[in-house]
Amino acid sequence: MTQSQRKILVTSALPYANGPIHLGHMLEYIQTDIWSRFQKMRGHECHYICADDAHGTPIMLKAQQLGIAPEAMIAQVQIEHEQDFADFNVAFDNFHSTHSEENRELASDIYIKLRDAGHIKTKTISQLYDPEKSMFLPDRFVKGTCPKCKSDDQYGDNCDSCGATYSTTDLINPRSAVSGATPVMKDTEHFFFDLPAFEGMLKEWIHSGSLQSEMANKLNEWFEQGLQQWDISRDAPYFGFEIPDAPGKYFYVWLDAPIGYMGSFKNFCAKRGDINFDDFWAKDSTAEVYHFIGKDIVYFHSLFWPAMLEGAGLRKPTSVYAHGYVTVNGAKMSKSKGTFIKARTYLDHLDPEYLRYYYAAKLSSRIDDLDLNLEDFAQRVNSDLVGKLVNLASRTAGFISKRFDGKLANVTDNSLAESFIAKQEVIAEFYEAREYGKAMREIMAMADIANGFVAEQAPWQLVKDDDKQAQAHEVCSIALNLFRILTTYLKPVLPRLSQDVEAFMQLELTWDNLAKDMTAHEIAPFKAMMQRVDLDKVAAMVDASKDNLQPTEAPKADKKADKKVEKKATTGDPLTDDPISDEISFEDFAKLDLRIALIAKAEHVADADKLLKLQLDLGGVTKQVFAGIKSAYAPEDLEGKLTVMVANLAPRKMRFGMSEGMVLAAGPGGDELWILEPHQGAKPGMRVK
């Protein structure tokens, strides 16, 4: 190899430690793993690092629901995550947790450097306070008697019994749900990172080639609106790291999450003993650092993270690579349809190599969504991997073993193999640029040529003629050498198959030995390497992924149950199920002020089954909206998206807080809801006409 060795650190976004991995997550880990494996095949020093993102309110609340400590929950989730990744052949060099001493030390050190440099500001906000427990109380921790219907044990701003909303001060006999004490209002100080101070650096960095062009252009909107200071603190109770010199204040999860890359790498360095942490993270580092992420967390990694690193005197990433979402059969993953498929459910039914190849065949360097069409999935895997690749060996290997003592021939014409080897730099460039789909097409085009050669030469006919034994030997030897070259190119994508091929060919598949002379090379007897995708197993996987909507036994009579409204049966025709409403005047329509809004923040709402709390940025004006879309979206899938909102809807007080508008969504409900997303070019604050 003529190229010089590179020092590379590559990461995938940290999976959140409150639930299982699903096939949407797996896109990123497969994409990154392929890139990491390719770099190692090329002889570079490449370390693939990841960790569980193990802090935040959702984890704290879920642990409380389970009746266990958050530490116990995240430890169990980490075991499950690591097993799923291992079974998908995702080869991390280190997988750690953000809830680690390495991460605590690094987060504190970075914060102190930012603070001492004047990049941390403080602001005062007011919250409910428990004087006995000395803790600030979210609404869910204040209870009392409803001032309307006099029902006991109601939350501070909403009554579950009568549906009334009211001010916390109107609650009769208010008490802390933690201690029973009467709460008071008290000011609390929050800490903010001074992001605007880094505007010049960020503008230069995002247009330096470190980001995909569409990502860089999208981030321009943040500068047009004006960068805002970023709240990096949360009050107890909170599961995370306490802020230095600020008792009761905790780092917001998104501060220590990206530092988790560094924490895991520091843990890895300690395990290895021969890798210097500072060689990769110091300001003057010449190593390369790459983050693979989903498009929903671009602004955290491309604004906050590089600014934090700059302010702390550390190096910034070489590049941040974003990918799109996964849809299944052309639609958002759905539990009711069985297309919200967990990694473990997939592994219980199908070979992980299938999905690795299918994702690779559809991945590019762009931020496009990827559709896992299950019918196309089966057809493509069966055609490409079984029909073209493995079939090349299965049709020819038997003749070598049975008739020619398991040894390849001295080939007189190597032109076909030489033409395949000549493609190595083209394929390498595609892998390097994350254009995996182009690489797969190039490889399969060669597989077509190889199979065409075998079909034309028909060794099964040649072996019948005693005078053509040498020709049959040579044809089969050429075919197996082509099979070896093709599998070498596919090794980053298909590691398990590559191991089987290495055992069969009795040599290691490396980039350096692509041109190896295979004369008289001995092979092992051929064994079946890959089965066709069984559509019955695909159907069983989908069925196993469906929510069981039917109760296992008849429910007992319940007054509350009598009040529940059953979901209406639908025909599947939107206009039949939901006819067009009566006409309104243009004047009535003109009263609506529809605006483009950026979802700056999305959060779960404690004790709310359907609601997400959204902070919507209208280009200088921020509105808080409670949206009934929890069944269809996770908060992390929404942040950074543009949507459309009704901006002039009268504020409505809810038990969880004030809702100042409404986001627009389509669909019958449940997990079949889709928020409206404007095309690129639309900007927060623009009126929808």
UniProtKB/Swiss-Prot annotation:
UniProt-annotated location(s): Cytoplasm
The record's function comment reads: Is required not only for elongation of protein synthesis but also for the initiation of all mRNA translation through initiator tRNA(fMet) aminoacylation.
Q: Where is this region: Disordered?
A: 546-577
UniProt cross-references to HAMAP family, sorted A to Z: Met_tRNA_synth_type1
This chain's protein is named Methionine--tRNA ligase
Q: Report the cofactors.
A: Zn(2+)
Q: According to the record, how does the cofactor bind?
A: Binds 1 zinc ion per subunit.
Compositionally biased region (Basic and acidic residues): 555-570
Top-level lineage group: Bacteria
The subunit structure is:
Homodimer.
Residue ranges of the tRNA-binding domain?
588-689
State the Gene Ontology terms under molecular function.
Answer: ATP binding; metal ion binding; methionine-tRNA ligase activity; tRNA binding
Q: Which residues participate in ATP binding?
A: K335
Q: Which GO terms describe its biological process?
A: methionyl-tRNA aminoacylation
Provide the alphabetized UniProt keywords. Aminoacyl-tRNA synthetase, ATP-binding, Cytoplasm, Ligase, Metal-binding, Nucleotide-binding, Protein biosynthesis, RNA-binding, tRNA-binding, Zinc
Q: Where is this motif: 'KMSKS' region?
A: 332-336
Q: One Pfam family this chain carries?
A: tRNA-synt_1g
Q: Give me the gene this protein comes from.
A: metG
Similarity comment: family membership: Belongs to the class-I aminoacyl-tRNA synthetase family. MetG type 1 subfamily.
Task: Name the positions where Zn(2+) binds.
Answer: C146, C149, C159, C162
User: Which top EC class is named for this enzyme in its record?
Assistant: ligase
Tell me the InterPro entries matching this sequence.
aa-tRNA-synth_I_CS, Anticodon_Met, Met-tRNA-synth_bsu_C, Met-tRNA_ligase_1, Met-tRNA_synth, Methionyl/Leucyl_tRNA_Synth, MetRS_core, MetRS_Zn
